[in-house]
Amino acid sequence: WYNTADKAHYIEGDDKNRTVLVPHTGSNKIFQFNFDSSTGVLKLKEGGVLNTGEQTGPRHIQFHKNGKWIYADYEQGNAVSLLRRSNGLLVTKQIVPSVPETWNGGGACAQLLLSPDSRFLYVANRGHNSIAGFEISKKNGQLSPIGFFATEANPRSFAIHPNGRWLYAGGQDTGKLAVFDRNRDNGTLLKRETVDAGIRPWWLQLVKY
């Protein structure tokens, strides 16, 4: 067992199998562990706790395929951040809202996913009931909004097909799944249909069989 902090919500490892990150929605911290793939042992990196600030609530985290850029969404802060490593430790390089600046209806971020080619980032917004899309700068990883795409109510989870052509978002309050065509050139989403998904769809996972 590894003691972290209040409300560890998610865990993500890098492609090199050396680093594991754990965001905490309750304590506003991201823990950075060294991972020994031969033993499975995690060890907290010295100085490896990033404080993201009060009322942020880091929830999900993803590594860009280049290994340099890391993205986290902030549940209470309705925002997404770009992180990098400086001397091996996480530092915040950018924070952008996940909802329109004119929105004052509250809500909370849920899931965060990169497109299969790591050119775009998507964040689910509960309350605003949307998927926010961002283009990723090839130069520095900075995020630029490309739009907010309406979903079913309370989109807690979504998934992107491995070929990048479709995005599926579950509406926890409606019991329906919204199916989007995804433009692989500009990242925009176009809703095609909604289908019944049972009672309060909690998590979406694409499975090959």
Where are the predicted features?
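Short loop/turn segments immediately following beta-strands, especially the blade-tip
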Residues: 33-42, 83-90, 134-141, 181-187
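Beta-propeller fold detector
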Residues: 1-3, 42-50, 91-98, 143-150, ...
